[in-house]
Swiss-Prot record:
Membrane topology: Lipid-anchor
Native source species: Mycoplasma genitalium (strain ATCC 33530 / DSM 19775 / NCTC 10195 / G37)
UniProt entry tagged with the keyword 4Fe-4S: no
Biased composition (Polar residues): 119-131
PROSITE patterns: PROKAR_LIPOPROTEIN (PS51257)
UniProtKB keywords: Cell membrane, Lipoprotein, Membrane, Palmitate, Signal
Lipidation (S-diacylglycerol cysteine): C25
Disulphide-bonded residues: none
Localization per record: Cell membrane
Signal peptide limits: 1-24
Protein name according to UniProt: Uncharacterized lipoprotein MG321
Length: 934
C-alpha cells in the first residue's frame, strides 16, 4: 500500500508512541525561541533504508501534529496544576484540517440511474484520463456534509454519526489555496506559479502507501483492509482500449506499466475515497500519517513506481514482488533519508529546515499559519505564539536519567522526571515554574506482549519447528485451545501480582492493563442504561484495569484467597475460568425439537469449571512436557534498544516472578529472558513478523480512537484464515466461541433453520427465538460482564449467547463466514473444535495444518475481513464491544502491561516560556503548543 510521505516514503511504520521523550543534548545556553528536544530512538541506525523504515517520517511519532492531513486532532485548553495535582486538562477535537468539507454518500437505490452509470462506464473525464470517474451519473445519494468549523469537533456535527455509519464514498473538498513550501519555508514554484495543494497529492499519498505494503516493506498495510478501501476506485488505473486484456481491467500498482500520472481525481479540489462498506472510524483514521499528502508534481514523487528507471528494485518471490532493500536507491526516493531531504516540501504547520546525522530542525510554516490556523479551534492563550522552531538531537539508547541531567545542564527545553529523581526535581525546581504535572486521560497506544503464532513453519512439503522453539514449546503454542495451555496462560496473568511489579516502573506506570482494550478507550453505558454505541454520551471507563481494596477488578474476576499485596507471586490465589470442549456422541444422534421439525447433531459441546492455582499451574506445565531439563523458555522480545534503570528493575523482578511461579520443588520449569530489540531497521520484519524466537514478543497496539479498532488489532487474520503477527489466533478463537454458542443443543435447531433461510436483516432475527442457553452460565467472565445485579448465571449465559448469534449473523451477512459451512459446523462441532483442544502429542500432520486456527479455514468466505467486521459490529453497541472483549481477554492472548494510569499524576519539566499541550494520551501536539515571548 502506499510508500508514503515525507520522510520515508517507502516505509514500514511501527509508530513508536513515546509520549514524546523530551530530552536533548547538552548546550550551555538555550535560545528561548527554539524548543530543544531529543530522541532515544536510533532513527539513522541503518542508512541503507529511509530513516529506520518509518512510512512518513521518523518524526511523525515524536513530533505530534508537525504534519497535516485531511483530518487531524487538535488539543485545546491548558494543562493546569496546583503544584501537586492536575486541576485542568487538555481537550481533544477531531477537525477538518486540509479539507474544507466532507460529504458522505451511499449507493443510490434508484436502479435506473445505476444502470445508466454501468452502461456508460463513465470513462470520459475532463482531463482525458482513461480512469473511470465513479462520481458521475448520479450513482450516489448524499447522506450529509460536514463543514470545517473552528468552534467544535466534527464528531459533534449532527451529520457525523449517520455519515460514518452509512457512507461508502467520502468526497473531500480540498483547500487549494494552500501552497507547498520548501526547506526555507518559501512557496514552491513551477512554471513561475506557486504549487498549490491538490487532490492528486492525496491520491499519490494513498498510492505510494499501497505500493509500499504490496512490496512487503510496510507492515502497516492492514489499515487499507481495515477501512475497506476500494483501491481500484480510489487510486487505480484502467488499461486502455488497445490493451490485450480488454478495456477497463485494472492494472496492479506493482505492475511496471502502472501510470502514476493517470489520476482518478479529476478536479484539484475534490478527492474521493471509496470503501467497500461503511467503516465508523474512517474520518478518525484519516488523521494518520499514512494518508497525508505528498506533492504529486515533485520529480521524486513521480519516480515512486516500479520500472526500468525507478529507484525501487525488487525480487520475485512466489509470484510476489518484494522490495530489494540492498539495491534500492533510497536517495532517489522522495523524503528517503538524509541525502534526500534537501528537496522535500511541506504543507503542514512545520517544515524541515535541515537534517543530518546529529539533528533535525523544524521551522514554523507561516503559510500554514496564515491559511489553516485561523480556521482551526483556538489552542493558544492570548500571550502565546506558535513555537517558532524545534531542534531534536539524536541520542540512541539514552535513558530518562540522561535526559534529566541534560535538562539541568541547560540543554533541553523539556524532560520527563525519572522516578529516582522526583524528590530532587521537587527541591531543585520548587517555585521556578519548571515543574509541571500531567495526568493521562486514555491510552493512545501501548506495547503489549503476546505469544508466538508460528510454532511450526513449512520447508517445502515438510513441517518443521520454527527457529529457537522446542518441540514441547511448539506443542503448548499450537494446542492453544487445550485446557493445559489455557491454564498456563491464565496462571501467568492471574498468579503474578502485576500491579506490584508496575509500581517499580513509576512514573511510567500506575495501573495495569489486563485487557486487549486499554483504559480510557472503552465507553460504558450511561447511567440511564441506554447504549452509548458510537455516540459521545458514554462514560470513559477503566473499570477493568484497577485494583481496589486489594481485589482485582474487571475481566480477571476477583480472586479467592489472599491478594498478598506486596508479593510478586500470588501463591495462595485462585483464578477461576470455564473451559469449553466438544465430544462425539458415539454414533447416537442428539435430536432437538423445534416448531418446524427436528434435526440431529453428531457431536455436542460442554463446559467445565477450572480453578487455576499454583499447584494446577505446575501440573499443566508438566502435562505439556516441561521439565527442568526441558523448560518453557519465556522470551519476551521488546522493541526497546535500551531501558531506564526503573525498567531494568521491573524486568528483573518480572523474570524472578516467572521463575518463582514455575518452580516445582527446586526444579525450574520456566526460564524467562528479556530480549532487547530495535523498533527501527530492516530486521524488524524478522524481529516481529518472523517470530523466530519463542513465546513472548512485543507489538504496538493501535493509536486511534474506538474500542473496535483495538479489537481489530487482536483479531486480524489473513486471506487464508491465518492469524497475523499481532493476534495469537484471537480471531479464530472468536469464531470458535460463536460455534460453541450456536451448537448448544437448545440453540442449534433454531439457528440451523435460520441459516437455511437466512436473509440480510438485523441480528435480532437470530436471537428473538432463543429463550434458553446455559452453556456459559458458570463462566465468571460472562457473569461479570453480562450478569444482573444478582450475578444470575443463567440470564448472563442467555445474553452472552444472543450476542454471539448476533455477531455470527453479521459475519454471515457480510460474507466473512459461509452460511452452509457454519450450518455444517454446528451440526458436528467436534469436527472443527477438537483439532487443537488436546495437548497429547498433537502436532500438524502436513504443511496445510501448521497454522493456528487452520481447522476453521473452510468456514471463511473472506477471512481477511473478520477483524474489520468485528470492529464495525463492536461500535454498534456497547454490549457488542463487551462481548468481544470478554471472549478475547478470557483467552489470555496478551500479558498484562503496566502503563500510566488514569489516576496517576506524572511530574515533568518544561521551561516556563513554553506551554505544551498534550493530547489526552499524553503525547505532545507541537502544532498546538505555545511560546511566551517575554
Amino acid at each position: 500500500m502506499k510508500l508514503k510521505k515525507r520522510y520515508l516514503l517507502l516505509g514500514s511504520t511501527l509508530t513508536v508512541s513515546a509520549a514524546l521523550i523530551l530530552s536533548a543534548c547538552a548546550s550551555s545556553q538555550l535560545n528561548k525561541g527554539v524548543f530543544f528536544t531529543s530522541s532515544s530512538a536510533d532513527l539513522l541506525k541503518n542508512n541503507s533504508v529511509p530513516l529506520s523504515m518509518f512510512n512518513v517520517s521518523p518524526t511523525s511519532s515524536f513530533f505530534g501534529n508537525a504534519y497535516a492531513g485531511l483530518t487531524n486532532y487538535v488539543a485545546t485548553g491548558t494543562n493546569r496544576d496546583d503544584g501537586v495535582n492536575v486541576t485542568d486538562q487538555i481537550k481533544e477535537k477531531l477537525v477538518l484540517e486540509l479539507a474544507l468539507s466532507v460529504t458522505g454518500y451511499k449507493k443510490t437505490t434508484h436502479s435506473g440511474l445505476k444502470g445508466r452509470a454501468q452502461k456508460n462506464g463513465s470513462t470520459d473525464s475532463s482531463d482525458g484520463s482513461s480512469k473511470n470517474d465513479y462520481t458521475k451519473f448520479n450513482e450516489w445519494d448524499a447522506i450529509g456534509t460536514i463543514y470545517r468549523d473552528s468552534s467544535k469537533s466534527i464528531t459533534e456535527d449532527p451529520n457525523y454519526h449517520k455519515i460514518t455509519q452509512e457512507a461508502t464514498r467520502y468526497e473531500f473538498t480540498i483547500n487549494t489555496s494552500l501552497s507547498w513550501v520548501d526547506n526555507a519555508g518559501r512557496e514552491v514554484k513551477q512554471n513561475n506559479q506557486p504549487v498549490k495543494l491538490s487532490s492528486k497529492d492525496f491520491e499519490r499519498g494513498f498510492e505510494t502507501y499501497i505500493l509500499s505494503s504490496n512490496l512487503g516493506f510496510n507492515r502497516n498495510g492492514y489499515f487499507i483492509d481495515l477501512m475497506g478501501l476500494d483501491v481500484e476506485k480510489t487510486v487505480g488505473m484502467d488499461k486502455t482500449n488497445g490493451s490485450s486484456d480488454g478495456n477497463g481491467k485494472g492494472i496492479e500498482i506493482t505492475d511496471e506499466n502502472y501510470d502514476v500520472e493517470n489520476y482518478r481525481s479529476v478536479d484539484d479540489n475534490k478527492f474521493n475515497v471509496y470503501l467497500t462498506s461503511p467503516f465508523p472510524f474512517f474520518l478518525s483514521m484519516m488523521s494518520k500519517e499514512f494518508f497525508f499528502p505528498i506533492p504529486h508534481t515533485h520529480p521524486k514523487v513521480k519516480a515512486l513506481k516500479l520500472g526500468k528507471d525507478s529507484p525501487l528494485k525488487y525480487n520475485q518471490n512466489n509470484n510476489r514482488k518484494i522490495l530489494d532493500q540492498a539495491n534500492t536507491n533510497f536517495d532517489g526516493i522522495y523524503g528517503g533519508g538524509v541525502n534526500a531531504w534537501k528537496d522535500t516540501w511541506s504543507v503542514g504547520p512545520y517544515y524541515v529546515e535541515s537534517f543530518n546525522q546529529a539533528q533535525i530542525v523544524f521551522k514554523r510554516n507561516q503559510i500554514y499559519d496564515a491559511i489553516i490556523t485561523p480556521n482551526l479551534p483556538k489552542t493558544r492563550q492570548e500571550n502565546e505564539k506558535p513555537i517558532p522552531a524545534i531542534v531534536s538531537y539524536f541520542q540512541p539508547g539514552a535513558t530518562p536519567e540522561v535526559f534529566y541531567s541534560s535538562y539541568i545542564a541547560g540543554g533541553l527545553s523539556a524532560s520527563a522526571v525519572p522516578y529516582s529523581q522526583q524528590q530532587d526535581a521537587r527541591s531543585r525546581f520548587n517555585g521556578t515554574g519548571d515543574l509541571r504535572w500531567l495526568k493521562i486521560q486514555k491510552t493512545a497506544q501501548s506495547a503489549q506482549v503476546t505469544y508466538s503464532g508460528k510454532p511450526y513453519v513449512a520447508n517445502d512439503s515438510t513441517v518443521q519447528l520454527n527457529a529457537n522453539i522446542t518441540e514441547t514449546e511448539a506443542k503448548f503454542l499450537y494446542n492453544s485451545e487445550s485446557e493445559e495451555a489455557l491454564t498456563i496462560r491464565a496462571g501467568i496473568n492471574g498468579l503474578i501480582n502485576w500491579k506490584n511489579l508496575a509500581i517499580i516502573d513509576l512514573p511510567n506506570s500506575g495501573d495495569v492493563n489486563y485487557s486487549t482494550v486499554p483504559f480510557g478507550i472503552f465507553k460504558e453505558k450511561p447511567a440511564n442504561g441506554t447504549s452509548s454505541g458510537t455516540n459521545t454520551d458514554g462514560i470513559e471507563n477503566d473499570y477493568y484495569y484497577k485494583i481496589n481494596n486489594n481485589q482485582r477488578l474487571g475481566l480477571i474476576p476477583e480472586q479467592t484467597g489472599t491478594f498478598q499485596k506486596d508479593k510478586n507471586v500470588l501463591d495462595t490465589a485462585t483464578v477461576k475460568l470455564s473451559y469449553y470442549s466438544s465430544t462425539k456422541t458415539n454414533g447416537a444422534q442428539v435430536r432437538t425439537a423445534s416448531t418446524s421439525g427436528s434435526s440431529s447433531q453428531t457431536s455436542q459441546v460442554s463446559s467445565k469449571q477450572v480453578s487455576v492455582t499454583k499447584q494446577s499451574f505446575i501440573s499443566a506445565l508438566k502435562k505439556v512436557g516441561f521439565t527442568g531439563n526441558n523448560p518453557l523458555h519465556f522470551n519476551i522480545k521488546l522493541g526497546n534498544a535500551s531501558l531506564s534503570s526503573n525498567q531494568v528493575d521491573y524486568y528483573n523482578a518480572l523474570k524472578q516472578a516467572l521463575t518463582e511461579l514455575g518452580n516445582d520443588n527446586g526444579e525450574n520449569l520456566i526460564i524467562p529472558e528479556i530480549i532487547l530489540g530495535d523498533a527501527q531497521g530492516p530486521t524488524r520484519n524478522e524481529w516481529y513478523i518472523g517470530l523466530s524466537s519463542v513465546l513472548g514478543f512485543s507489538y504496538w497496539s493501535p493509536d486511534y480512537d474506538g474500542v473496535g479498532t483495538w479489537l481489530d488489532a487482536a483479531t486480524q487474520l489473513n486471506s487464508e484464515g491465518i492469524g497475523e503477527v499481532i493476534t495469537y489466533n484471537s480471531g479464530s478463537h472468536i469464531v470458535r466461541t460463536l460455534l460453541l454458542a450456536a451448537s448448544q443443543n437448545n440453540v442449534f435447531n433454531q439457528i440451523e433453520n435460520k441459516l437455511q433461510n437466512n436473509t440480510t436483516t438485523n441480528g435480532k432475527d437470530w436471537c428473538s427465538c432463543i429463550t434458553s442457553a446455559d452453556l456459559f452460565k458458570d463462566d465468571p467472565y460472562v457473569i461479570k460482564n453480562f450478569g444482573t445485579n444478582g450475578n444470575n448465571g443463567t440470564s448472563a449465559s442467555l445474553a452472552f449467547t444472543k450476542k454471539a448469534l448476533s455477531l455470527l449473523k453479521f459475519l454471515v451477512d457480510n460474507k466473512v463466514l459461509k452460511a452452509d459451512k457454519v450450518k455444517e459446523a454446528i451440526k458436528d462441532p467436534d469436527k472443527y473444535l477438537s483439532k487443537r483442544s488436546k495437548i497429547d502429542d498433537n502436532k500438524p500432520a502436513n504443511v496445510s495444518d501448521i497454522h493456528i486456527g487452520y481447522e476453521l479455514k473452510d468456514l471463511y468466505d473472506n477471512a481477511a475481513q473478520l477483524n474489520r467486521f468485528n470492529s464495525i459490529w463492536a461500535e454498534q453497541d456497547t454490549d457488542n464491544a463487551k462481548f468481544l472483549i470478554t471472549v478475547v481477554d478470557s483467552y489470555f492472548p496478551v500479558l498484562p502491561v503496566s502503563a500510566p494510569g488514569l489516576n496517576e499524576t506524572i511530574p515533568s519539566l518544561l521551561k516556563p516560556w513554553f506551554s505544551l499541550r498534550n493530547a489526552p494520551s499524553g503525547i505532545a501536539t507541537m502544532r498546538d503548543s505555545g511560546y511566551i515571548d517575554e
